[in-house]
Regions:
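Terminal RNA-binding accessory module
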Residues: 1-72, 76, 357-358, 365
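Rossmann-like S-adenosyl-L-methionine
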Residues: 2-11, 19, 220, 224-235, ...
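Short, conserved phosphate/pyrophosphate- and ester-handling motifs at nucleotide-, phospho-/glycolipid
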Residues: 40, 165, 287
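Short beta-strand micro-motifs enriched in acidic
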Residues: 46-50, 135-139, 203-207, 454
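Conserved loop-to-beta-strand segment in the C-terminal subdomain of adenylate-forming
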Residues: 54, 208-212, 443
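Extended interfacial segments that mediate partner engagement and assembly in macromolecular machines
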Residues: 60-72, 78-187, 207, 222
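Flexible loop/N-cap segments at domain edges
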Residues: 200
Length: 454
């Protein structure tokens, strides 16, 4: 067909999966992105939106299922925006993620020989998330609902028991819902900016069993809070109950003001032997089982013997820094978010670690300044940047400092490939690469790479 229009129907075979988890199929050279499909599916689809050389379509029916297609466990898998790959066999998900890393390293990084180790998958790829944020709303019959947003929308898909989350979520949400109904608490409306209850944050320490609940409200205080606390304390492990004030017209979920209702205001958890204190506003990896494997790999790649000076850039609350400090002489952590550095310093104290020092600021500003003014030294540099990757000034300073090893932890293998190419062109050799599946059933994959100075 020379020109595709909305609602045109067609058949195609899915050949690949996009970065966002849509299946990719072609008809006469025209590329289609089709949600809820798996590589190998032959489907009938309906065009929803078309551009010059590609379009988006809705899968109408599966004509011939892929050998790697499975029945999703979750009843709302198709509507919910959280799991893009749940219809794909888990082993095939891992293969897809490995291929994604490999392809980015060859196409973007220009690497011809990639020393790639097998991806670290999960033995049990369900119930792995230690944190969930549930929005509240009303359905068409004016019943209170909570769950998750449908893909690319703010329409709530009712789901109190996400199979990626902890089993306690459902009981906690039922208590909160009953409390709202009992006392007639109004739900927040994004369009009118009226109503009180916005979200519920739930966190759990997997190794300690400690639970946290934080209600996000569009108001100064939470009515009938004593009754809510009394009910929530019936759940084993309940350690911290609070509310967060967020009166802004914003998509940001948490407000900066947190008022404590019960407990110490935080929960604790361990990654390996390191203890972490987690408040409602703390960043903490959501999959602690895989985080331990990811950081263990980073620590192994760092090759520490006890005498090294290590810089940990984009260090967050010091999760990798404290892991490294167990085996290094000195660790310096850098992070732009002041609250995260406060948490990092508290976590260092909590573990009695005196060989760690933290700086607040941008990695691309702190590292050059420390290098030029104070001639700081590094045997090993570890980076764990956001999705956009490392700033070029930061990479340039790493090259000037000349550490023996650079360990790169990445949540986006495309920007990883770009940055590895930059370092490889300036005296470093790619020695090892390994994927780690932190988010089963989604299209995301973490990667750890080791570069050594030639």
């Amino acid at each position: 067909m020379s020109e595709w229009k909305k609602n045109d129907k067609f058949e195609t075979v899915i050949e690949d999966i996009s970065e966002t988890g849509e299946g990719i199929g072609k008809t006469d050279g025209f590329t289609w992105f089709i949600k809820d499909t798996v590589i190998g599916d032959r489907v009938e689809a309906k065009a929803m939106k078309t551009k010059k050389s590609y379009g988006f379509a809705r899968m109408e029916r599966i004509l011939e299922p892929s050998k790697n297609r499975v029945e999703p466990k979750c009843p709302v898998a198709r509507q919910c925006g959280g799991c893009q790959l749940q219809a794909m066999d888990y082993k095939e998900q891992l293969t897809f993620k490995e291929r994604k890393i490999y392809n980015n390293l060859t196409r973007i990084g220009g690497f011809t020989e990639i020393p790639m180790l097998p991806i670290i998958g999960m033995d049990e790829p369900w119930r792995y998330r230690n944190k969930a944020q549930f929005p509240w709303g009303m359905d068409k019959e004016d019943n209170i609902i909570t769950g998750f947003y449908a893909g690319r929308t703010h329409s709530i898909i009712g789901c109190e028991d996400c199979l990626l989350g902890i089993e306690e979520n459902e009981d906690i949400l039922k208590i909160i819902k009953a409390h709202m109904e009992r006392f007639g608490l109004r739900l927040y409306d994004e369009e009118t900016h009226k109503g009180l209850i916005r979200h519920t944050l739930i966190r759990k320490g997997f190794k300690t069993g400690e639970l946290m609940v934080c209600q996000v409200i569009n108001g100064k205080s939470l009515p009938h809070q004593e009754e809510l606390v009394e009910e929530l304390l019936k759940i084993p492990g309940m350690t911290s109950i609070s509310y967060s004030v967020n009166r802004e017209k914003t998509n940001v979920i948490m407000g900066n003001q947190v008022e404590n209702l019960y407990g110490p205001g935080y929960i604790s958890d361990y990654i390996g032997d390191v203890k972490y204190r987690i408040s409602p506003l703390s960043f903490y990896q959501v999959n602690p089982v895989q985080t331990e494997k990811l950081y263990g790999t980073a620590l192994e790649y760092a090759g520490l013997t006890g005498g090294e000076t290590v810089w940990d850039l984009y260090c967050g609350i010091g999760t990798i820094s404290l892991f490294l400090a167990q085996k290094a002489k000195k660790v310096y952590g850098v992070e732009i978010v002041p609250q995260a550095i406060e948490d990092a310093r508290e976590n260092a104290k909590l573990n009695g670690m005196e060989n760690v020092e933290f700086f607040v600021g941008k990695a691309e500003e702190v590292l050059p300044e420390q290098f030029e003014k104070n001639q700081v030294y590094a045997d090993v540099i570890v980076v764990d940047p956001p999705r956009k990757g490392c700033d070029e000034v930061c990479l340039d300073t790493i090259v000037k400092m000349g550490p023996k090893r650079v360990v790169y932890v990445s949540c986006d293998s495309a920007t990883l490939a770009r940055d590895l190419k930059y370092l490889a062109e300036r005296g470093y050799e790619l020695s090892r690469v390994r994927g780690c599946d932190m988010f089963p059933h989604s299209g995301h994959v973490e990667t750890v790479a080791l570069l050594t100075l030639v």
